[in-house]
Amino acid sequence: INVTDYLSQPVVIDEKMTAYDAVIALFTEDVGTVFVTAAEILVGLVSRKDLLKAAMGNNDLRTLPVRMVMTPVSKIIYVEGDEKALVAAQRLLEFEIDCLPVVRIEEDEQSKKKELHILGRISKTNITRLFADCAAGRRA
């Protein structure tokens, strides 16, 4: 069973947006993580914890660029779309995180840098749904 069988829609904001925009996205979409993109390429993510730290630092979230509070892509744990759901579950447990971006990796022809294109997200809830489906005999 691949992660793409159980992924959910990611909540995404542009890197030009503010930390306040990220707060609004978190609460209106009822998620714990918002992915940050630039020209549809994943550049980071923002969690509730990141935003709480920024707010406690007496920052004005309405003017603070989301880039200043996000976890950069170089530190993000992810899964590729063709990986097994078991791999995603193991990473969630190993790194003690709530969700992973599901990505397609491409190489930029000019810079030869790896670019992550976000396909979705897989969370503990998605993995629990898979487990429940297997236990109920709805998945082999």
Predicted regions: what is each one?
Residues 1, 17, 46, 64, ...:
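Short beta-to-alpha loop/turn elements within the nucleotide-binding domains of ABC transporters
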Residues 1-11, 64-76:
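Bateman (tandem CBS) regulatory domains
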Residues 5, 71-79, 104-117:
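Short, charged helix-to-loop "capping" segments that act as catalytic/coupling loops
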Residues 7, 30-31:
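A short helix-to-beta-strand capping loop
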Residues 12-30, 37-38, 77-98, 102-106, ...:
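The conserved cystathionine-beta-synthase
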Residues 29, 64, 74, 95, ...:
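Structured loop/turn residues at beta-strand edges in well-structured enzyme cores
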Residues 31, 35, 41-57, 111-135:
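Short beta->alpha transition motifs characteristic of CBS
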